[in-house]
Every structure is written in structure tokens, then in C-alpha cells.
Amino acid sequence: MLKWYVINTKANNELLAIKKLKKENYNVYCPMYLSVVKHARKIRKILKPFFPGYLFIRLDIEKDSWISINYMIGVKKLLDDGKFPTALDHGIIDEIMLKIN
């Protein structure tokens, strides 16, 4: 059964991890917001993650090869309880998507 899990990424590597995970056909979600950055009389708008250092991934841990995720570029680890990844409660990601979009 597909459930949402949390990935802890290496510092400022969310986009790299997303790229690598999507290349392997994983369903990944990283809520972002537009930030205005002022530097040396220039104003830039950049996308930043709402949860820096974290991504959400939708997996079926009984079917998907989740152990390899921990070894992907940009990924620190898939959050777990010591043995298996810890799934988020049903509906949390849906609520985040509704509030952000």
C-alpha cells in the first residue's frame, strides 16, 4: 500500500535528491515557497523548501526497494524506527498540499 514517508537530505541538496529520486521513478514531494533575496542592490526571487533538509516520498515498502534510497546522492536517510521507514499519518501530505497551493 502506498504511503508517504520522510527523507532527510544533505544540507541544501533537496533539489539534487529530487532529481535523482525522480530519475528512479519515485513519487517525491517538496513543498516550496518564493523568497525575495536582496544582495548588492539586486533583488532575486528564489524557490526555497518549506521544510529545509526534508522531502516526502510515496512508497509501498513491501514492493519498492527502499533501502537503496539511503545511498542516493543528496539523501542522508529515510527516516525510520530502527528497522523500517516510518510512514506519516494518512492525510498529512494532503493537508500540506491544500494549505500551500
Where are these regions (language model features)?
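Acidic-enriched and Gly/Ser
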Residues: M1-N101
